[in-house]
Amino acid sequence: KSTLCLALCRFIEPFAGDIAIDGVSILKVGLADLRDRITVVPQDPALFEHTLRFNLDPDGKASDAEIMELIHKAALTNLVQRDPLGLDAMVHVKGGNLSSGEKQLICICRAILRKKKIVVMDEATANIDVQTEKTIHDLIKTEFRSSTVLTVAHRLNT
């Protein structure tokens, strides 16, 4: 399953068969162009030693209002409220000051804010509690309605 995700992003080249997007082989699409169409939410969240705002929106394209609305929808309000710096609170190295579920939620929010055509979710909700997971699945259905979402999961309900 994860190999398919790696091949889709061209981190590895398929040795047989083909992967096509809109009928065009990914091997015929420039690597930068291909990766510009895709966002990945990995099983092991990739976070930066930087502010919460930067981790949510490293491109700096979203307004604070957009970020806060998404934080509310993604059940991350407590994370922002527990630090007086709010969105400017620092995330430690590898998100050491966050729970594994919070890390995954941040990466899901980042993917939503990026608004890419293809979303790869590799065990993206594995560390989120059942109640929040339902909220996130509803959010994913709404926010990615115009995207193709490839989900890799061990649990059937994810």
Roles of regions detected by a PLM:
Residues 133-145, 157:
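Helical segment within the ABC ATPase nucleotide-binding domain
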